[in-house]
Swiss-Prot record:
Sequence positions that bind Mg(2+) 2: 295-296, 339
Post-translational modification: Phosphorylated by RAF1.
Subunit-level organization: Interacts with RAF1. Interacts with GNAS. Interacts with the G protein beta and gamma subunit complex.
Stated name of the protein: Adenylate cyclase type 2
Amino acid sequence: MWQEAMRRRRYLRDRSEEAAGGGDGLPRSRDWLYESYYCMSQQHPLIVFLLLIVMGSCLALLAVFFALGLEVEDHVAFLITVPTALAIFFAIFILVCIESVFKKLLRLFSLVIWICLVAMGYLFMCFGGTVSPWDQVSFFLFIIFVVYTMLPFNMRDAIIASVLTSSSHTIVLSVCLSATPGGKEHLVWQILANVIIFICGNLAGAYHKHLMELALQQTYQDTCNCIKSRIKLEFEKRQQERLLLSLLPAHIAMEMKAEIIQRLQGPKAGQMENTNNFHNLYVKRHTNVSILYADIVGFTRLASDCSPGELVHMLNELFGKFDQIAKENECMRIKILGDCYYCVSGLPISLPNHAKNCVKMGLDMCEAIKKVRDATGVDINMRVGVHSGNVLCGVIGLQKWQYDVWSHDVTLANHMEAGGVPGRVHISSVTLEHLNGAYKVEEGDGDIRDPYLKQHLVKTYFVINPKGERRSPQHLFRPRHTLDGAKMRASVRMTRYLESWGAAKPFAHLHHRDSMTTENGKISTTDVPMGQHNFQNRTLRTKSQKKRFEEELNERMIQAIDGINAQKQWLKSEDIQRISLLFYNKVLEKEYRATALPAFKYYVTCACLIFFCIFIVQILVLPKTSVLGISFGAAFLLLAFILFVCFAGQLLQCSKKASPLLMWLLKSSGIIANRPWPRISLTIITTAIILMMAVFNMFFLSDSEETIPPTANTTNTSFSASNNQVAILRAQNLFFLPYFIYSCILGLISCSVFLRVNYELKMLIMMVALVGYNTILLHTHAHVLGDYSQVLFERPGIWKDLKTMGSVSLSIFFITLLVLGRQNEYYCRLDFLWKNKFKKEREEIETMENLNRVLLENVLPAHVAEHFLARSLKNEELYHQSYDCVCVMFASIPDFKEFYTESDVNKEGLECLRLLNEIIADFDDLLSKPKFSGVEKIKTIGSTYMAATGLSAVPSQEHSQEPERQYMHIGTMVEFAFALVGKLDAINKHSFNDFKLRVGINHGPVIAGVIGAQKPQYDIWGNTVNVASRMDSTGVLDKIQVTEETSLVLQTLGYTCTCRGIINVKGKGDLKTYFVNTEMSRSLSQSNVAS
């Protein structure tokens, strides 16, 4: 098995290299794959079936020979020819069953089989009796038909072989019979009839081959599309899982994924959700965890000196390093708030050493910042606080999901950081108990620095770093970066140093197709770019992605080709029944039978062409009687009407007048193409007419034509030579009898041209026809055919005896057409199955793509999501953008802190969070309104809602806009704040609460960017953001506080503002602030809620 796999891989590689391009510069990989597909799916099974049919026919001929009791010495040539042919075909059959030999000697096998069949035909013609004009026409017609339909010739070679076959038969017969004395008056008509039969066989065979090749090409294309969709689906699923898991922990990600898929699948899922008045809450309680809060001291001052790119790079590198430290210490990063970082140990699986993990992480963070400070000379430090307890963790709201934690213990951990000291890890007494003496500590006195700690009587400690007393050699000298500090800004020194850490970029794995082949959805290490030294490798990977995709597609195609082997369709299939070829899925079977068939009119056309050939043949050889004219005239009118109805749609498009009759014909044409029952009815009528007309006039032979004295076979010597001559002359007048048999064969072929019509229907029609024809040949008209053969031949062989030749020929054609019909039915169903699978997988891909987009847009604004979804090398770089005018809003519910309690009644705070989830979800609902399409939710911080406007504008276009238009988004933000107030009032009425919203708004320049590879997060930074936050924290309940600059803009937009006065803002000094008119707020918010 492994040798075969290696052989296939070498074959794939070699052929792929050969297929890299042709003379016209186009890839040729599809050509050789299609050849292989065509070879194994069509050519191989058909040539196997042909050999089985021929060998079976040889055995049947031998059986018939001995059953008839013919003398061996009279038919030596027959007994030599048939067993020899049987041996040759059996040897070829053995070789054909060896796949490798078949592929190498495909053309040779085709040529040998064709030559052997032609040789058999001439041997049958020359031996067994006198040569007649109708001799072996059925056998050569069989050769012509199978050359097109079953031998693996291309169309050109098939035409050449068939023309040689038919022309050689015509020429040989003409030469032989022209040299024979007597009986030449009908020779020309018989030869012409033979030519018409051969032309009909060529046309039917070429038609069959052309349509089958088109169908196979379509099946191949559908197979390729399905495999491509499967590869893409696998990629999308892996990408979606990675994306989801990069945003949310696995234990809630799958629940939320199921809800999104339900939402994307349409109204049915929505109807189920409407029965619940509450939004789903994805929050769980976890006990015995430790929470770490860390703040970079001095970063605000450093950030004010940074360019947008430097700021985002620094944050990404710093927090990327912290994520790495968190992973090493079994901690989960929760969120990034500006320059604040917090994480938890003990989620989602409880860990006994959670406190040690957090303390170790805090020490490592301080050590990492110390290295940065020592290496760059930039005055930054780390303040870390750790507390242990219980948390509620999960996601709230409908948009911009961010995994978060809530509880009194989380609040305490936050204050542990605020009450800490730079460079130290500040822990609570609870955490100290969990450490079990693992670290030395000293008094922390946190209650002196933070009133919350003092109010709650929290005893705090500082952890003594075990490495603190062991100084590294670096402290003995100033690094080169510091020595050069006078020559470059601190931010430049920081950026250059942090680049050496090589933190992964956000969403770096989104479009790496080399991740497609990883197992179990694991991200390979090659997917994570580590620093700029990998840029060249990334470029090479991107250039080779298409080639790898082609290789994977080719490999999957080879596997599919292996699955579509000659024997596979006869074995058990998951989708198709073995014998009947019906689909196991009843719905699929119904859909298949109801499939529209626009090509049906061409089937009828080809059948009518065969009918016309039968008519020409019988006109050439039959006596010209009134019955002949009337019968074919009536049949012609019926078929012409059917043909007209089928083509009515195309014919009437040119007609300007639309009479009721024309409209009925046009409608009928569409019904025939689109509905199965009219097609079935017309198929039965058309084939029945042709099959009946093949033998109809045989029943109207005159008595003189039907009765022939058996003189040639009599032993009475009293008959004179003149009587024998009369008998022969009468027999010659019945020269048309074999052409009834050939007309029957053409009638059977007419059934096979209805390629996509029900296989069982065609089989039933041909079976009834075969039984009827054999009844005529062997019973009702047996004496006529038998007497005719005995008059012409003294001891006729099997192929000279009309009854035997007719019955055997019809049976061989019946089996051949049955095999072709079944083969065609199988691949038609396979094509339908592939299309159905492709359609379903296409829908699943679209769902996955939409899911990925929803997930990405749940983290990023739409225009930023497009940046990462775009397939370009720029995705490898960090996204950052600076804006000159962005309006930032912080809306908080201070009362919620008092409302939040942890008790058994409210499930330890879970029910409080359920209400908060409803509030945030209702706030998020407003974002879907068209008037608020420009509002971008940034994040929620506890019960505070942060949003911004002006982020969707192209920065370069900000200055080109008119002043009023430039500030329109600030008015939109105020309107949004009004709407939030109205939503909260509505929630208060339903929940019997009295929450008040406190809003702070500011506008100005900001820097936007995406940071973090583990959990990518879109955020905005800058003084504008800090002041907006202060506008909220220093604000008044039920008021919207804005800065003086923002109030001036709002007044130009028609809003009224009331001066609050001068207030002291932490870090900004004294600022003059304003309240937006709350009466306007109240009226507008109520109208928003009503709308």
